[in-house]
């Protein structure tokens, strides 16, 4: 993405971290337009109607943009080569054994390298710089609805070959869950603030299996005192519809029997 201006006084180094405050302080329409146009190319590659990244969205969010650019001394132009947008989100994740984890994790929300700069190491330079600034390891990163190309990139550059898809379209890697337990005597640190809930929820093929603790509410028709306690509630689709119909009739009867307020 070419800009007919010298952006060195505005952006500074060729790898730059732009948090919302820094983006707002730029106050340069040329830079704003260049970043927005680069984000439009990213959206076009993903076949999206609207771009995921704009300077306006960055200013009004908690996301951070890592931008790679350079100044061409011969042609006297600046070139924006690529970017990565990241942000921290609280996620509920499931490993391959359907055990649940929750916590705040760094998410890659948008990632793009200009077609004229691809296969030149620009993408890895951006992510390596981002990892160093965010104090995060590659296996601790979550990907927001990644493309096959991005998954292949993470596999080739960082050796992350076992993606675990989530029902929220986020993807994490198996190493994230292995970090919570010692494997072969080597323990990797999990992301800050991560923990495994005491009542994990398992999502299968349309069914939700919840394991309750010993001190679960007694007497509740769908909660027992012991783990794996039998459930006597009618959980079939027909039963659920019948329960909702009965509740609707009860509410209607209550409304009709109530005294008017006027």
From Swiss-Prot:
Residues in coiled coil: none
KO phenotype (gene knockout): Mutants are partially insensitive to body touch.
A molecular function GO annotation: L-lysine N-acetyltransferase activity, acting on acetyl phosphate as donor
Keyword match Transferase: yes
The UniProt record lists the keyword Transport: no
Stored InterPro entries: Atat, GNAT_ATAT
Binding-site residues for acetyl-CoA, renumbered to this chain: 111-124
Domain of life: Eukaryota
EC numbers on record: 2.3.1.108
Entry GO terms, CC: microtubule
Catalytic activity: L-lysyl-[alpha-tubulin] + acetyl-CoA = N(6)-acetyl-L-lysyl-[alpha-tubulin] + CoA + H(+)
Pfam families to which the protein is assigned, alphabetical: Acetyltransf_16 (PF05301)
Tissue: Expressed solely in touch receptor neurons.
Domain N-acetyltransferase intervals: 1-177
Main EC class the enzyme belongs to: transferase
Keywords on record: Acyltransferase, Transferase
BP-aspect Gene Ontology terms: mechanoreceptor differentiation; microtubule cytoskeleton organization; neuron development; regulation of microtubule cytoskeleton organization; thigmotaxis
Record function comment: Specifically acetylates 'Lys-40' in alpha-tubulin/mec-12 on the lumenal side of microtubules. Promotes microtubule destabilization and accelerates microtubule dynamics; this activity may be independent of acetylation activity. Acetylates alpha-tubulin with a slow enzymatic rate, due to a catalytic site that is not optimized for acetyl transfer. Enters the microtubule through each end and diffuses quickly throughout the lumen of microtubules.
Official protein name in the record: Alpha-tubulin N-acetyltransferase 1
Organism: Caenorhabditis elegans
């Amino acid at each position: 993405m070419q800009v007919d201006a010298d952006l060195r006084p505005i952006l500074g180094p060729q790898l730059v971290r732009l948090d919302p405050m820094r983006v707002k302080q730029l106050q340069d329409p040329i830079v704003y337009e260049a970043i927005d146009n680069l984000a439009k190319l990213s959206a076009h590659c993903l076949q999206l109607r609207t771009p995921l990244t704009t300077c306006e969205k960055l200013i009004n969010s908690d996301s951070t943009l890592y931008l790679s650019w350079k100044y061409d001394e011969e042609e006297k132009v600046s070139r924006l080569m690529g970017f990565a947008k990241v942000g921290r989100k609280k996620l509920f994740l499931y490993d391959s054994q359907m055990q649940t984890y929750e916590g705040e994790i760094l998410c890659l929300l948008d990632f793009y390298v200009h077609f004229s700069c691809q296969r030149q190491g620009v993408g890895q330079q951006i992510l390596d710089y981002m990892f160093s600034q965010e104090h995060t390891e590659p296996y601790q990163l979550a990907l927001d609805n990644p493309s096959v190309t991005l998954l292949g990139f993470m596999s080739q550059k960082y050796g992350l070959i076992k993606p675990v898809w989530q029902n929220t379209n986020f993807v994490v890697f198996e190493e994230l869950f292995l970090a919570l337990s010692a494997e072969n005597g080597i323990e990797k640190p999990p992301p800050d603030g991560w923990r495994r809930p005491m009542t994990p929820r398992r999502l299968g093929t349309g069914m939700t299996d919840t394991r309750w603790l010993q001190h679960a509410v007694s007497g509740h028709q769908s909660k027992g005192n012991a783990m794996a306690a039998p459930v006597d509630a009618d959980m079939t689709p027909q039963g659920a519809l019948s329960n909702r119909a009965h509740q609707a009739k009860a509410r209607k009867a209550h409304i009709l029997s109530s005294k008017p307020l006027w």
